[in-house]
UniProtKB/Swiss-Prot annotation:
NCBIfam families registered for this protein in UniProt: PRK05313.1
Top-level taxon of the source organism: Bacteria
Annotated source species: Actinobacillus pleuropneumoniae serotype 3 (strain JL03)
Protein name: UPF0210 protein APJL_1516
InterPro entries associated with the record: UPF0210
Family named by the database record: Belongs to the UPF0210 family.
One Pfam family hit: DUF711
Gene3D superfamilies: 3.20.70.20
Subunit structure: Homodimer.
HAMAP family the record matches: UPF0210 (MF_01221)
């Protein structure tokens, strides 16, 4: 396939002027062969495997970035859910394993490591419960370890005992980490995927290879500029512009993924098409929606605009790569998106509207700061609502919520870097405590029976 000079110039512009980057190259690593009944032996095995397989990742990313002139922002590791790997130890805490993950990730120079996780959509094993109860201390005593809990699925329903425990875990983490920052590294999922390269929800699924390369691209700024410079008048034409631009973005990610796999001698897994914003001006998903004709993200019509965007990105990306996977859509993390921050500060973008938007976008309620006085059962209720959307619609949904101790509505919290800052958003005054405390399981919906 010949490449026109105009296409080369277009790619250079995407990088130089529109904040285009490859957001992450993530190596997924299977840890089943590290299992030992001795937790010290387990920790030693985990450290050795991660540092052996991941030792060249950062250098490879630098070489590829220099070769193609494409910024590769993060290099990350995901591992098999630790609740599965640590079960044989019968330990009453897995904090030491989190600390081992932290040391291993720092030793090879990656930015985050995910997989301090438990999959409890249908029930909790003793190991799952130990892991979840270890999360607050693990987040407090590590820097770059990320944790996730899958509490529901379309096939299993929603495990409300796990939802209750997840709410309590998030609240406890907020209380013992500065400004609740530990909660920025915890995601609670429904229908979690096994090949997600993005943090904080990445883990290496049991059905994956021993090691795999997954790539996440990002180009909100590219899409916004494409829309602003197009002659699109109808929404049909808008969708076409998004689709064609997503194709171009995806081709770059595919190239980087295939090259990284070749250099590292690790199979290429998937390319995640998700539009991942940053707090930088010109790198916002909210501003794409506004470029479609909304005066501000969060006003009426926002959910429809986001649905159009998400679907068109998928269609364009699927044409460009046979390896599309992960979450693949649009992320709407409030603190990480300059346009979302502005909309939330104006009061137009509310928690309720964000919940509606999650029914049509990539993940869920992401990087939302709430008052520190928010009770655990309210957090559990928010998680249950979000999980219900995912369960009924057969899609991945998630909650990454930060109760900021000592702060209330009208104030804001600064996380720094890619995590940005967030205004404290109000939650409902009514109580769901009795509902959450009932426990049990919300049964799987009728659409789960597909065989």
């Amino acid at each position: 396939m010949s490449i026109q000079s105009s296409e080369i110039i277009e790619t250079i512009k995407m990088v130089a002027d529109q904040n285009f980057d490859v957001r992450t190259i993530t190596i997924g690593i299977d840890l089943h062969d590290c299992i030992s009944a001795d937790i010290d032996e387990l920790n030693k095995n985990i450290y050795q495997k991660i540092t052996t397989i991941g030792k060249d990742l950062v250098e490879t990313a630098k070489i590829l970035s220099a070769k193609y002139g494409i910024p590769i922002v993060n290099q990350r590791i995901s591992v098999t859910p630790i609740a599965q790997i640590a079960a044989a130890t019968k330990a009453d805490s897995y904090v030491s394993i989190a600390q081992t993950l932290d040391r291993a990730a720092k030793a090879i120079g990656v930015s985050f490591i995910g997989g301090f996780s438990a999959l409890v959509q249908k029930g909790m094993s003793p190991s799952d419960e130990v892991l979840i109860r270890s999360i607050p201390e693990a987040m407090k005593t590590t820097d770059i370890v990320c944790s996730s809990i899958n509490i529901g699925s379309t096939r299993a329903g929603i495990n409300m005992d796990a939802v209750k425990l997840a709410g309590e875990t998030i609240k406890r983490t907020a209380d013992i980490t500065p400004e609740g920052f530990g909660c920025a590294k915890i995601v609670v999922f429904c229908n979690a995927v096994e090949d997600n390269p993005f943090m904080a929800g990445a883990f290496h699924g049991s059905g994956e290879a021993d090691a795999i390369i997954n790539v996440g691209v990002s180009g909100p700024g590219v899409l916004k500029e494409a829309l602003e410079n197009s002659n699109a008048t109808t929404l049909t034409e808008v969708a076409e512009v998004v689709k064609k631009t997503a194709f171009k973005i995806t081709r770059v990610g595919e190239l980087i993924g295939q090259e990284a796999a070749k250099m590292l001698n690790i199979p290429f897994g998937i390319l995640d098409l998700s539009l991942a914003p940053t707090p930088a001006v010109g790198d916002s998903v909210a501003r794409i929606l506004e470029a479609m004709g909304l005066s501000v993200c969060g006003t009426h019509g926002t959910t429809a605009a986001l649905a159009l965007l998400n679907d068109a990105v998928k269609k364009g990306g699927m044409m460009a790569s046979s390896s599309v996977g992960g979450l693949s859509g649009a992320f709407i993390p409030v603190s990480e998106d300059e346009g979302m921050i502005a909309a939330a500060e104006s009061g137009i973008l509310t928690l309720d509207k964000l919940e509606a938007m999650t029914a049509v976008c990539s993940v869920g309620l992401d990087m939302i700061a709430v008052p520190g006085k928010t009770p655990a059962h309210t957090i559990s209720g928010i998680i249950a609502d979000e999980a219900a959307i995912g369960m009924i619609n057969s899609k991945t949904t998630a909650v990454r919520i930060i109760p900021v101790t000592g702060k209330d509505v009208g104030e804001s919290v600064e996380f720094g870097g890619l995590l940005g800052y967030a205004p404290i958003m109000p939650v409902k005054e009514g109580s769901c405590e009795v509902f959450v405390n009932r426990g049990g399981r919300i049964p799987a919906p009728v659409q789960s029976m597909k065989n």
